[in-house]
């Protein structure tokens, strides 16, 4: 990705001639990849881990995702408000990586549902906040060095997707081949390397301490549209979370297909998301962000219709193209849409966007657990389909920026 980075980013003539290799941008790319890998080694197998290792019922599995999302929101709100007001994001990211390591160690050796939920998830929440903080730091770095923020951000997102191409199949291979302990220890290693990279290579962006206001600032302009966008992104991420919680168990328990297929499906979708994100970032100016979000929602609708109707490995893998368009555009454009609706509030906009994923997890956790407990895993995809329809109706009302 270093090549494409330099094609996309304008470099001042002075900086261009003596050093063609830009260490800071490369470090950002590697850190984005590592924070992605740390997450991608844990999330895809979590519902399976809770079912098989912790022996939790479907409702308890769903509740675990909900609980972890709620704890995550409190942690990230606290950190976001703090980092936008006072200083250095860099030391904060290192701290988050350190707690991420402790979380992985706990999951590696503990099998008590409640300890994992309250202690493990609290630590993981700090770990997962390393990612949005890294994006906020990247945005500040881009603004300060006069870079094209949209493209730089899209390329960083693509790194996270790349991590999700490798992560899920690797997670299933490690968990099925060597056990969950080895899988969680691998994630811990990713956090260690990531923390070290941040500490040694990322820039410190000192801020002048501002007068403290609320933790997360409300949008100063476009309030109605920011709220609508929050609902849209929450619904879209919610369907995706339903899919991540539900799909592995659906594939294994109801379709009786091999376990590794679940990992391959997630990896395939993530691989196809990379070109989708970059293309979306490229065309955002020409077509507008609202149009692209509508394209995404239609793709999502078709994807869940497919999940309800096709049950062979080849077709399930083919469907991932629609899933990639759906999530690739959402991941690439959603955050930038928030930043455009909330000018001058990059940290709050980014966190608001990140919280749509968490609220999506809250809704998905409760729905997936209850629906699977009462009916079956197949029914969960009907819920996702309804959420896609709601998304499309909200997208008719939002303004373009």
Region spans (language model):
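Helix-loop boundary and gating motifs at the non-cytosolic
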Residues: 17-69, 240-254, 262
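Hydrophobic core of transmembrane alpha-helices in multi-pass small-molecule transporters
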Residues: 33, 114-131, 234, 315-329
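Helix-to-loop junctions at the C-terminal end of transmembrane segments
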Residues: 74-88, 175, 276-288, 372
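A late C-terminal transmembrane helix in Major Facilitator Superfamily
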Residues: 344-374
């Amino acid at each position: 990705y270093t090549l494409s980075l330099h094609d996309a980013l304008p470099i001042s003539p002075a900086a261009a001639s003596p050093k063609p290799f830009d260490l800071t941008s490369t470090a950002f790319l590697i850190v984005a990849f590592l924070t992605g890998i740390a997450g991608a080694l844990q999330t895809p197998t979590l519902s399976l881990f809770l079912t098989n290792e912790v022996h939790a019922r479907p409702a308890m599995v769903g509740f675990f995702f909900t609980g972890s999302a709620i704890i995550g929101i409190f942690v990230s709100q606290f950190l976001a408000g703090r980092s936008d007001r006072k200083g250095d994001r860099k030391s904060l990211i290192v701290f988050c990586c350190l707690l991420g390591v402790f979380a992985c160690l706990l999951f590696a050796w503990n099998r008590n549902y409640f300890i994992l939920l309250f202690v493990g998830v609290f630590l993981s929440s700090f770990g997962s906040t390393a990612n949005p903080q890294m994006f906020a730091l990247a945005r500040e770095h881009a603004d300060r060095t006069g870079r094209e923020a949209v493209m730089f951000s899209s390329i960083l997102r693509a790194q996270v997707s790349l991590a999700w191409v490798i992560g899920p199949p690797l997670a299933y291979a490690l968990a099925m081949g060597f056990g969950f302990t080895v899988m969680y220890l691998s994630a811990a290693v990713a956090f260690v390397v990531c923390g070290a990279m941040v500490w040694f290579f990322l820039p410190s962006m000192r801020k002048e301490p501002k007068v403290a206001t609320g933790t997360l600032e409300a949008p100063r302009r476009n309030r109605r549209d920011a709220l609508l966008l929050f609902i849209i992104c929450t619904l879209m991420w919610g369907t995706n979370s339903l899919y991540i919680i539900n799909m592995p168990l659906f594939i294994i328990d109801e379709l009786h297909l091999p376990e590794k297929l679940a990992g391959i499906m997630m990896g395939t979708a993530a691989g196809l998301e990379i070109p989708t994100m970059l293309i979306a970032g490229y065309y955002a100016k020409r077509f507008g962000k609202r149009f692209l979000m509508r394209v995404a929602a239609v793709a999502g609708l078709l994807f869940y219709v497919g999940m309800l109707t096709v049950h062979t490995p080849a077709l399930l893998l083919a469907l991932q193209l629609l899933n990639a368009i759906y999530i690739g555009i959402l991941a690439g454009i959603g955050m930038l849409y928030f930043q455009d609706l909330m000018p001058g509030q990059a940290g709050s906009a980014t966190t608001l966007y990140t919280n749509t994923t968490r609220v999506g997890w809250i809704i998905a956790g409760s729905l997936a657990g209850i629906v699977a407990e009462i009916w079956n895993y197949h029914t969960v995809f009907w819920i996702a389909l309804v959420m896609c329809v709601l998304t499309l109706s909200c997208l008719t009302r939002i303004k373009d920026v």
